[in-house]
């Protein structure tokens, strides 16, 4: 996703996170996704890291496809800045940059595969 980070650099809304600061927690309502502009954010389940998302990565994209409460905790592991992307902005990006949509789908598929224990097909 690093090649698309330029799409988020001019985001209308950003948030700075200190080390250990929570971006969201399990059960929080999910209405936005985030793009990591700087730093690293861990995705955790029951306090255990399931993925570290670094500069250029995205977090929380699933709620823009299927609205639901957050299923993981997201915590900054170094000083970080994230772009906040709402549904309207997400739809615009998908329509204007079809390769962005494909990359989001690949990220989602990889996360689903990793969490289900399904091996990757060749």
Feature locations, PLM:
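Cytosolic regulatory regions built on CNB/CRP/Popeye-like sensor folds
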Residues: 1-122
């Amino acid at each position: 996703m690093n090649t698309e980070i330029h799409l988020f650099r001019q985001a209308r809304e950003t948030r700075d996170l200190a080390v250990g600061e929570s971006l969201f927690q399990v059960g929080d309502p999910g209405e936005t996704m985030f793009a990591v502009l700087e730093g690293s954010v861990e995705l955790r389940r029951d306090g255990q890291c399931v993925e570290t998302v670094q500069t250029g990565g995205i977090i929380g994209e699933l709620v823009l496809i299927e609205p639901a409460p957050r299923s993981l905790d997201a915590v900054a592991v170094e000083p970080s800045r994230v772009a906040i992307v709402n549904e309207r902005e997400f739809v615009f990006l998908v329509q204007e940059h079809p390769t962005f949509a494909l990359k989001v789908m690949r990220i989602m598929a990889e996360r689903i595969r990793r969490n289900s224990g399904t091996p990757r097909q060749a």
